[in-house]
């Protein structure tokens, strides 16, 4: 299973210089997990930069994969990761999600 960080989604959606790096993981929807936090972050950024229609299209693409809710277990695992690895909350939630799903 793969988890693509929100920055990876945004790079892919913008067809940025590193979009190809993320494309194979994003297009393999059967093996892709999308934390709900990623939905929030991507929707917000695309809404801000390109408008609601593009933002809705972005999250529609994301929802073709398996959506992972922020469960109590993930919410309690992420702070430990954040403190141990000295990373921000969003990154620790992404990492906790990836670790929880193998």
Positions of the model-derived regions?
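A general structural signal for well-ordered alpha-helical segments in protein cores
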Residues: 19, 39, 55-58, 71, ...
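Short secondary-structure boundary segments
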Residues: 36-37, 91
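Short active-site oxyanion
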Residues: 29-32, 63-66, 100-102
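Conserved glycosyltransferase catalytic-site signature
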Residues: 6, 72, 91-92
């Amino acid at each position: 299973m793969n988890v693509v960080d929100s920055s990876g989604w945004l790079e892919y959606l913008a067809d940025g210089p590193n979009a190809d790096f993320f494309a194979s993981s994003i297009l393999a929807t059967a093996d892709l997990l999308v934390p709900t936090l990623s939905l929030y972050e991507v929707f917000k950024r695309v809404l801000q930069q390109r408008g609601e229609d593009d933002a809705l299209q972005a999250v529609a693409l994301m929802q073709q994969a398996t959506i992972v809710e922020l469960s109590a277990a993930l919410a309690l695992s992420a702070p430990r990761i954040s403190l141990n690895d000295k990373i921000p909350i969003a990154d620790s939630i992404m990492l906790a999600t990836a670790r929880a799903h193998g």
